[in-house]
Amino acid sequence: MKQQFAAKHPWTILAAGAAIQVLTGLPAAWGVFQKPVMEEYGLSEQGAGYAFALLIAAFGVGCVLGGFLQDKKGPRCAALWGTALLCGGFFAAAFLPGWAGWGFFLAFSIPAGLGTAFLYPSIQSCAQKWYAGRKGLATGVIGGAVGLSGAFLTLFVRAALRGFGPVQGIRGAFWALGALTLPVCLAGSAVLSDPPQKKQQPSGKNTLDLSPGQMLRTKQYWLCAGAVCFSTPAVLLFSPIILKLGMERGLDETAALWSIVLGSVGSAAGRMLMPMLSDHIGRRATDLGLFAASLALSAAFWAAQGWWVVVCYAGLTFCYSALAAVLPALSTDLFGLPHAGVNYGFLALGQSVGSLAFPFAANLLALENGRHLLAMAGAAAGFAAIWALRPVQKDPR
């Protein structure tokens, strides 16, 4: 019955997916969580940064696990598990005693990272199957909601820190987010279902159907996963400290907060517009342009002062989020639709590697400039990986 309704109204899949994703943009909004989490749970700045890095790493691993579940049991099952994990992370963080800050990684970072991972690829692959001829549109709408989530969560957490009704402080924010996310994600997950097999066939040229094992044996997989890894430092090295960085470079706290809000707007715009552009000019050309822009913006960000910090950061979030949003369509172009969920998950492992390796390298360098150097080097390496990328010619055996 639900599949028949969706067949007549496929926009319901996009609407359900977008409603869920508006609540899952934790990485984009982490800057507003960082300071209150440090104060409430007794974490150092480095410890809170690692909590963020572990969340991103769990997202990458969860994309593989959620992808397997989505491909075997369908998007609804994967999304329901994602809902349970994400809401469990919110509620566990609210329960966690302040003296047990070491447990924040286990209570929040891992389940929330896994939960968002189970939700994101299940929604993206489901939407692409319903809109097989317009994959950029499908990923753009869902990705745009992820970008807007950063702005929503930033404003929500700031309101909670000021206090409204029973919602007081960061614990109140975690309680309220869990209570809000649970019904929205349950309702949205119930709508998700794959289309009939015939509807999934793209109207274009790609007839490949690579299993995960076959995909892993291609050069294209390693180039794509490498590009995903190299896209991370431009934003993920700075998002946990963007408020502090803005104030160090001449902004007051209110003005520095705009870096998160406008960064979220940039993220939403990148996720919405660039996948649709890639439908017209191609995924490779789109990614090359985004990596080139990321390299230029990373260089400008190094020297930025005052409001230019906000401008450069918003541009970087546009590029980073656009690269992430084009990835699902690039994956199905290269490797086919039938295993889209798990294949995307394996590509997202590049994000896990980057989210852990680059912060570790930056701390090892022990220089603020090290972050900027790594961001520029990552953008250049990502450009080189995409430049070398070519279509898969045949199924590897």
PLM regions: where:
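Extracytoplasmic gate region of multi-pass secondary transporters
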Residues: 30-37, 213-276
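A late C-terminal transmembrane helix in Major Facilitator Superfamily
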Residues: 141, 150, 334-367
